[in-house]
Amino acid sequence: MHVKKGDKVQVITGKDKGKQGVILVAFPKQNRVIVEGVNIVKKHSKPSQLNPQGGIITKEAPIHVSNVMILDPKTGEPTRVGFKVEDGKKVRIAKKSGELLDK
């Protein structure tokens, strides 16, 4: 997967197109990510030990990783991700600026 937890991304397609946020959780096996403030759904929950009140909870749902693009750290624009080997380690780079994405 070209994105990781903590990456700043922009949604490029779907109902939340144009929104930006940080990846909270990545699910590599399903190729899905949860982005902060994107794809908000309402979940109806029964009263339980943790939530004695129950009711309707709003939370982020996963979206497919192909619907997000990482933001270039230099320009702040959406960019594709490239890979390069530096000192025997595989690192991610932004295609637009050539900037390193991995610290």
UniProtKB/Swiss-Prot annotation:
SUPFAM superfamilies: Translation proteins SH3-like domain (SSF50104). It holds the Pfam family ribosomal_L24. GO terms for molecular function: rRNA binding; structural constituent of ribosome. It comes from the Bacteria. Belongs to the universal ribosomal protein uL24 family. Keywords: Ribonucleoprotein, Ribosomal protein, RNA-binding, rRNA-binding. PANTHER family: MITOCHONDRIAL RIBOSOMAL PROTEIN L24 (PTHR12903). This is Large ribosomal subunit protein uL24. GO terms for biological process: translation. GO terms for cellular component: ribonucleoprotein complex; ribosome. One of two assembly initiator proteins, it binds directly to the 5'-end of the 23S rRNA, where it nucleates assembly of the 50S subunit. Part of the 50S ribosomal subunit.
